[in-house]
Amino acid sequence: MSSRELIILGCSSQQPTRTRNQGAYLFRWNGEGLLFDPGEGTQRQFIFANIAPTTVNRIFVSHFHGDHCLGLGSMLMRLNLDKVSHPIHCYYPASGKKYFDRLRYGTIYHETIQVVEHPISEEGIVEDFGSFRIEAQRLQHQVDTLGWRITEPDTIKFLPKELESRGIRGLIIQDLIRDQEISIGGSTVYLSDVSYVRKGDSIAIIADTLPCQAAIDLAKNSCMMLCESTYLEQHRHLAESHFHMTAKQAATLAKRAATQKLILTHFSARYLNLDDFYKEASAVFPNVSVAQEYRSYPFPKNPLLNK
């Protein structure tokens, strides 16, 4: 199993269908379990996906329309029931604090887990852990809505043959990293001569929105982009009036953002068959998948290497 993968727990929008639950998305990032927009029934979806809810340690709510948050309370209660020892970090728009509290304390139960709230009022870097950072930007929806980007830093990868040919080893390598150049054997060796930069992996989560610059910025050069595509082009008027996107619009955003992989989700219940979503989007952006519940999407290999 990939250490970095996106698992679809639900892909419907406001109304579930017989085959699609309200949206919920689990992103596994090495040892982290990041749960995005847990809609109604998310706890049960974990069972069908054969995934332990205890793997979750961060929960993100883009906005407080029901299909993006009604599963929050039950997930917190389940984690409480399972007596998880790790803290549960919750990220959400600060303007929705009262709704977060209602979901968290909507029933009688004795909370013993540590829930750490991160109400977000400012756009930009929310947290930077060194190994990865969380970024939030406001999208263009009917209510205060956040899109997310998870990014790891770029890393220096050395070329062993180049190091060996120049006699560079041991502590000298640390000097080279620090100073970007060293003098050895009567010549100057630059860091770029013996290494390349591997671009850090990244994923963008684009929830309910009209096409907007913030969505493009979040997905810019990302490895993967999970994006709402509630409607097909034939119902574009509905997308515009409800502040959503069509599959074609989502694909156009992906193309402009130069993401590697687009995954469409958040489908209106009016569509029983989703084949046309793929046809519409792939005509604009070839590397596209239509979200399927319980399916895992491993991260594509990052080809962005500066040698």
UniProtKB/Swiss-Prot annotation:
Binds 2 Zn(2+) ions. Zn(2+) 2 binds at residues 67-68, 208, 266. Its cofactor is Zn(2+). Keywords: Endonuclease, Hydrolase, Metal-binding, Nuclease, tRNA processing, Zinc. It catalyses: Endonucleolytic cleavage of RNA, removing extra 3' nucleotides from tRNA precursor, generating 3' termini of tRNAs. A 3'-hydroxy group is left at the tRNA terminus and a 5'-phosphoryl group is left at the trailer molecule. It is an enzyme of class 3 (hydrolase). One of its GO terms (molecular function) is 3'-tRNA processing endoribonuclease activity. Zinc phosphodiesterase, which displays some tRNA 3'-processing endonuclease activity. Probably involved in tRNA maturation, by removing a 3'-trailer from precursor tRNA. HAMAP family: RNase_Z_BN. Homodimer. Belongs to the RNase Z family. This is Ribonuclease Z. The gene is rnz.
